[in-house]
Amino acid sequence: MSRTSTSRYWSAVVGALTPYVPGEQPKLANLVKLNTNENPYGPSPRVLEALRGEVGDTLRLYPDPNSDRLRAAIAAYHAVSPDQVFVGNGSDEVLAHTFLALLKHERPVFFPDITYSFYPVYCGLYGIAHRAIPLDDAFEIRVDDYLAPKGGVIFPNPNAPTGRLLALGEIERLLAANRDSVVVIDEAYVDFGGDSAVPLVARHPQLLVTRTLSKSHALAGLRVGYAVGQAPLIEALNRVKDSFNSYPLDRFAQAGALASIEDRAYFESICARVIATRTRLVDAMESLGFEVLPSAANFIFARHPAHDGEALAARLRERSIIVRHFKNPARIAPFLRITVGTDAQCDALVDALKALC
């Protein structure tokens, strides 16, 4: 049946939604895939061992609804208590619960105009008023733009897709000016060059920090994310979770995430490799005439003064190299967001760009 003949059964909310568009997951082999910010090095061997250990009769049983062992490990890692940790199916689910539990108020929630594009989707889904605050000319967040009364603030740090980092001192200034509304720092990429805001949680009851194991822990396929905040904020998230899905993390996700959190040496080693490759990639791109924004993430955001971003992405694809291009907002249409892959993948990209530029 056509969409026209079936959409009459939709709710008004669904009809008005503009859903999030995920990055492409191509089925073709032998591609240089640099479009969705996955970690190129794979999870810790301990993760694979833990996953194998979950194969058995216990799969007939429901998993721990509260992920107690995983929450305890995350709490130990961040030097907080387990009741300050919430876990979910990727940070996207954690963020969705956060919007409903903590950011749905009469006043609008503020976030940057160039940022993670799921934020306005959540607002549309839950009927949350929002205001997109323009980044400055250097694509940076200006804290002074977030000081007016509001229903909350959320932004990634480093920001996505720009990769730019807001210093902790500026975050503290933002918190000082927003004592009566929740401030959410989305730290999906912070392990690649930023300082976490988690230590600020002890002094700021309105602060919630969300994180994911998809990027720095190379576990995008398991879907594990979490939030750290003072206990009342975590209780609010749990109330939403238990009204939606009381068993969000399956046995494999809990076991794999626990093993990854506990293997700190492996985690630190792959982050260091990504950071080193990023430095090489930035130098190579700049030598080809690209402007590359300063990045504290596992991707770079770059444009060439003589080449259209969309056309360049298409020509790279013809050479079996996939990067991410955003048509909107128009201000970032000249840019390409390029995941930092292995040295070999990035060398292949640079060689292709030498031929194209």
Swiss-Prot record:
Xref: SUPFAM superfamilies: PLP-dependent transferases
Entry keyword annotation includes Transferase: yes
Named cofactor requirement(s): pyridoxal 5'-phosphate
Molecular function GO labels: histidinol-phosphate transaminase activity; pyridoxal phosphate binding
EC number in record: 2.6.1.9
Enzyme class: transferase
InterPro entries given in the database record: Aminotransferase_I/II_large, HisP_aminotrans, PyrdxlP-dep_Trfase, PyrdxlP-dep_Trfase_major, PyrdxlP-dep_Trfase_small
Catalytic activity: L-histidinol phosphate + 2-oxoglutarate = 3-(imidazol-4-yl)-2-oxopropyl phosphate + L-glutamate
Domain of life: Bacteria
Pathway(s) annotated for this protein in UniProt: Amino-acid biosynthesis; L-histidine biosynthesis; L-histidine from 5-phospho-alpha-D-ribose 1-diphosphate: step 7/9
Modified residue annotations for N6-(pyridoxal phosphate)lysine: 215
Keywords tagged on the record: Amino-acid biosynthesis, Aminotransferase, Histidine biosynthesis, Pyridoxal phosphate, Transferase
An example Gene Ontology biological process: L-histidine biosynthetic process
HAMAP family for the chain: HisC_aminotrans_2 (MF_01023)
Subunit and interaction comment: Homodimer.
Family designation: Belongs to the class-II pyridoxal-phosphate-dependent aminotransferase family. Histidinol-phosphate aminotransferase subfamily.
Listed name of the protein: Histidinol-phosphate aminotransferase 2
Lineage: Bacteria, Pseudomonadati, Pseudomonadota, Betaproteobacteria, Nitrosomonadales
